[in-house]
C-alpha cells in the first residue's frame, strides 16, 4: 500500500458512506439530529487520518466532526468499539490505565468501530450525526461494500 497517497479501499469506504447516507437521513429522527450535518473519520493504525463532513451548516459539521474525532481516536487508542470499551471498564473487566484516556474523556456513545483491511491494516472508524446505532450501521454497511474490508 502506498503510504504517501490515498488508500483506494478507504476512498471506496468513504464513497460507500456518501452513497448510503441519504437513505439513513430519510428517517426523520436521524435527519432531525443535526439537520443532515454528519461527519466520518477513519484513522489507519499508522496515524494517517481520513475524513469527510456532510451537510451545509459549518457549525453543526464542526460539532459532529469533533464527536467523530473523539470516537475515532478512542477506537484507535484502545482497539475497542465505543460503548464496548466503557462497558468493559465500568464492569471492572478492563483496566483503562494503559490506554491513557481519562474517564471524563470516554465518549460512551456508539458510533466508533474497529476495522481491518485485507492486508492486515487496522482501522478506527467513526461516524457522528445520527442516532448512535445508525452511526454504527452506516459504517457496517459501507464496509460490507468494500472488498477486503471488515468490521471487528
Kindly give the residue locations of the regions a language model identified.
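Flexible, solvent-exposed loop/hinge segments and secondary-structure transition points
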Residues: 1-117, 121-151
